[in-house]
Structure formats: C-alpha cells, structure tokens
Amino acid sequence: MIQTITHIMIISSLIIFGIALIICLFRLIKGPTTADRVVTFDTTSAVVMSIVGVLSVLMGTVSFLDSIMLIAIISFVSSVSISRFIGGGYVFNGNNKRNL
C-alpha cells in the first residue's frame, strides 16, 4: 500500500515538473530581455535537476546524482558568464570602480 502511494506521488511529481519545464521553456524562448532569459535558464536547470532527482528515486539508484552536480555546475558558470556579458564585461575592484 505504501509503495503504491509512493509510486503515485513520484509519477505525479514528474508530471508537475514536466508542466513546469514546458512553461519555463516557453518563457526562455519568448523572454523579452536577456535578463528574463537568464532567470528562466536558472529555473529550467533547477527543474531539470529536480526531474533527474525524482527519476533517481524512482529507479532506486544514486548514479544520477553526478549528473545533477554537473547540471548545477554548468548552470552556475553560464549564469556568471551571461551576467558578466550583460554588465559589459566589467569586474569590480576593491574601490568599487570598474576596470576592464
């Protein structure tokens, strides 16, 4: 009985995450500004990590956890890169002055 309830909850969470992924991909394509697309990309990567985690629980394996870490690292690096691109490539020094 408990296994059936757990299985139903896992399947329903996959459906909800799938709907969230479709909404995020729509906003990623439609987003009017680059900042909207960056936020949507971060949200999409979080949803994908959640889907992979739920699939890991469903299959009863921990081998997918490495791919979750890889998605998180790629998401972080891309967010920092795009943020730097939006900022014009400037970085801050200790005096709060911008340098190239």
Curated annotation (Swiss-Prot):
It holds the Pfam family MrpF_PhaF. The keyword Transmembrane helix applies. Belongs to the CPA3 antiporters (TC 2.A.63) subunit F family. Signal peptide: none annotated. It is found in: Cell membrane. The lineage of its organism: Bacteria, Bacillati, Bacillota, Bacilli, Bacillales. Its main location: membrane. It comes from Staphylococcus aureus (strain MRSA252). Keywords: Antiport, Cell membrane, Ion transport, Membrane, Transmembrane, Transmembrane helix, Transport. May form a heterooligomeric complex that consists of seven subunits: mnhA2, mnhB2, mnhC2, mnhD2, mnhE2, mnhF2 and mnhG2. GO terms for cellular component: plasma membrane. PANTHER family: NA(+)/H(+) ANTIPORTER SUBUNIT F1, NA(+)_H(+) ANTIPORTER SUBUNIT F. It comes from the Bacteria. This is Putative antiporter subunit mnhF2.
